[in-house]
Each structure stands twice: as C-alpha cells, then as structure tokens.
Amino acid sequence: MTNTKTLEENISFESALKELEEIVKKIDNGQESLEMAVNSFERGILLKNHCEKKLKEARLKIEKITKLADSTVVLEETEV
C-alpha cells in the first residue's frame, strides 16, 4: 500500500474497493498507531474518491449505450 497523495489511475475498481475494505478493518480494529491510522485514512479517502469516479464513469457509459440502443429511452436523474 502506498500512502501517496495521488492514486494510480490504472487501479481497478475491485482492487481499490478491496484495499479500502482492508483499511477500514484495520482502523476499526485499532491495529495501527495513530500516525499510521491517519495515513491509512488519507489513503482511504483517495480510494473512496477513485471508486466513486469509476462508478460514475460506468453509469454514464451505460446511459450512453442505452441511448444509442433506443433513442426513445428517457433517463431519470440519479444521485452520484
């Protein structure tokens, strides 16, 4: 796990989610020192944002495919 301020763009949604779940478990169990927990929390925020971005991209792609498949489809606004 790297604690850089940026996250590799090529990390998959599944890998990011798995790492985020591991971070949450460690923090919840108190398995890290305060400093490490803060660093892990920072990494967790980056992972969460990355996962949200990937989900939004997937949703937009599905909407685009749906529009192309049937031009009469009406898409409802969804919260991201």
Curated annotation (Swiss-Prot):
Origin superkingdom: Bacteria
Main subcellular localisation: cytoplasm
GO BP: DNA catabolic process
Keywords associated with the record: Cytoplasm, Exonuclease, Hydrolase, Nuclease
Pfam families documented for this protein: Exonuc_VII_S
Enzyme Commission (EC) number: 3.1.11.6
Keyword match Hydrolase: yes
Compartments where found: Cytoplasm
UniProt catalytic activity: Exonucleolytic cleavage in either 5'- to 3'- or 3'- to 5'-direction to yield nucleoside 5'-phosphates
Purpose: Bidirectionally degrades single-stranded DNA into large acid-insoluble oligonucleotides, which are then degraded further into small acid-soluble oligonucleotides.
PANTHER family xref list: EXODEOXYRIBONUCLEASE 7 SMALL SUBUNIT (PTHR34137:SF1)
Family according to the record: Belongs to the XseB family.
Name used for this protein in its record: Exodeoxyribonuclease 7 small subunit
